[in-house]
């Protein structure tokens, strides 16, 4: 967008020169009726450069016009600006919008204009007197402001009467005049500013055709609804003000039109003339200096022997000083050349070329002694932690300080590489310095390892088992007791597709059938259990309330793997929907469950999950409470397949079907003394 420097000859916009013989909308017809005087009337008071600014500008102009009628315009602005009464400010803005339109409509009648100014003066006096405080007559109705509101209603009625007397009873002329005298001139000025041109009279008179036809039809439909509503319910300041406010949105309809104009149809922008004076380089402008980024990718092959080795890092470490290659092959991993990892006197050589702009990093090689069950990572004493650019992935051996908690062997075989990667949390592995003299580091966060087999430079994923890494006390010399406890509880290496759990995981075991690794939030359902008093008043909704508790209890924990959590959430939402209509529909569908084998299989799966819930005993107690206090088991399992499966999962012996412990107190002796009150059911004394 280039703004013109000097006045340009008129530009005829394409598609705007032909005379419009048929009008698509009433809005276009209203404008065409005054087309002969279009050139003279298209000179509105509102000036701006952006189409979307028009509604705010017209509101500000309306407030200014109203406040000018008062004795102190600045005081009125201060009262209005500092007020927190939203409803009162909205009422004043509606009155101001209609008042300004009435001033334009009565410009030819001095008497009507005098009456308007009098109404405006009285209205502004009420604003000063009221102060637009919390209890304001301009806001919602209050008994304290009844007299002041009666005065405001009288002023609004006078304003409408003045408009009707000067428009022949046709209030629609206000919107037509607003569009013709304010909206279209504003659109013309925005076009001239944005395109750097001057519109000729014919183009200015055809601005209506720029408005999107579909949007214009919507405006026309709203006009018809407004007229019909006025005929049925009469006129009011608020209704008329909102109708005028709708017309101020017309400029917004042009934003998409401007974006769809082809580039070859736009007028050539005016190029500013060069400033006077000598121009260096023969008048040629110096081109801006660009930034060149050269990326060299080395596609050389890595040679890997078949000796036993474990590389638990994307970065390979050796004893000598080595280089970090700033270019990477997959845009996400940094490689280090000339690396060697020693495990059981076997070594692996990986060589790669690097670019000239690589940086140097010094570290000591990682060594593992399987006989002492210790894992140490020695590094230079100048650094307390490994740089996060290559950290997060460290070298750990297959026999490193690991206690196998499974029955399968976790020994590494020939031609296998164990690669440790960050967990799903995306956190970088941290290293805590143990001894500043020996510069030893220990693993401080959980790591996840994946086994890969190496065969002719090809890697194949292998399954592995769960191992717990617990540092020995000899490794933790000089570390505080708090840090020791944290490391011993958190150091877990997950190397397979089983769900690994820590020692303090509340015994959530992998017994959830197809949802391996599923964990639930602890005690999250307690907030949904109603009190005993409330249970007495939900006898007709006991089923939904109880299933809501079960649905909350089955909410997966954030530590559950995302694919498992997503799959189980889908099953939970289908069988236990959080919608009474869907729940009733599912109950009706389950009335003939034999015709829906897939649904029956899903119910059995959910029942199995409930059976192995770690807090099943607590949920069974809640079910017993619902049965006694809310009459839950009055709805027998024969008539509610979903409820019966949930109760069977919690209470495996089926005692809830006929046991007296699961009967509501309403079905026991003395039920004839139960009375219904406002706050529920009570026993007569």
Swiss-Prot record:
One of its GO terms (cellular component) is extracellular region. It holds the Pfam family SipA. Residues 369-385 have a biased composition (Polar residues). Coiled coil: none annotated. Residues 497-669 are annotated as: Actin-binding and polymerization. Residues 291-304, 417-429 have a biased composition (Low complexity). Residues 315-337 have a biased composition (Basic and acidic residues). Residues 265-386, 402-432 are annotated as: Disordered. InterPro entries: SipA_actin-bd_C_sf (IPR023224), SipA_C (IPR054043), SipA_chaperone-bd (IPR023225), SipA_N (IPR015138). Keywords: Actin-binding, Secreted, Virulence. Belongs to the SipA/IpaA family. Actin-binding protein that interferes with host cell actin cytoskeleton. It stimulates actin polymerization and counteracts F-actin destabilizing proteins. Potentiates SipC activity; both are required for an efficient bacterial internalization. This is Cell invasion protein SipA. It comes from Salmonella typhi. The lineage of its organism: Bacteria, Pseudomonadati, Pseudomonadota, Gammaproteobacteria, Enterobacterales.
